[in-house]
Amino acid sequence: MSLRTKFFAMTYDRQIAGAEKAGLRAFRERLLAGASGDVIEIGGGTGLNLSCYGPAVRSLTITEPQPPMLRRLERAVHEHRPDAKVLRAPAEDLPFEDDSFDVAVSTLVLCGVDDQPRALRELRRVLRPGGRLLFIEHLRSGDPATARLQDRLNWLNRLVVCCDCNRPTLDSIRAAGFTVTQVEHIELPKAPPFVRPAILGSATVPAAAPRAPQDGARPTAAPPPAARPAG
């Protein structure tokens, strides 16, 4: 575990506080108002989404790969959502059976995973047919000048907030086999110009559609949301 990872976890809430007050919190609330049933959230971070989930959520499972973030997430869950289940797991290798969840949530996470296409395939795998992916994510700008700026300064963004702001995330969602049903191009408040482009939206897993190939076979099971045994 790097000092940078520890520092990022310690300072994340302070870094993002201005953006939350200026509109990011409202984006989260609007997105998660539609969450229902068995929900999985990847990259739960410090738990900023917890209080946005409503009574329609039957079960909430949150994954987080980084121990410093995980400790803060566990404290937030205890305070805001004690019925939620928290696990340490990367988005690229979710420890759940196929078809375990009704809704998956990713907010400012797909920009920071090591392998975005694999993470999206995993989300599609654990969602039931007709399941939904709800997302707020950074996006490579459609404006050529801004996109060039994103490419030029992405190293700085990775250094400060551990993410790539120039990924073609919407294309990646579609490539993973999701059908994008709603997308809104937004600007992240209080962010530098090259980090502002983002999307808020939802995508669905086609009912009874063939699955995208995975790197290893996993058994299929209907009951939700059961963790795969270790080993």
Predicted region positions:
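Conserved beta-strand signature within the Rossmann-like core of class I S-adenosyl-L-methionine
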Residues: G130-H138
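Conserved class I S-adenosyl-L-methionine
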Residues: M1-G37, L48-C52, M69-R72, L149-D151
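A short SAM/SAH-binding and catalytic strip from SAM-dependent methyltransferases
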Residues: D102-D115
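A short acidic, Gly/Pro-enriched loop at the edge of an enzyme's catalytic core
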Residues: E92-A104
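Class I SAM-dependent methyltransferase SAM/SAH-binding core
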Residues: I40-D93
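A short glycine-rich, Lys/Arg-flanked "PGG" loop and its adjoining helix->strand segment in the class I
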Residues: P117-P129
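Short alpha-helix
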Residues: C162-G177
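Core SAM-dependent methyltransferase catalytic element
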Residues: H185-D215, P219-A221, R228-G231
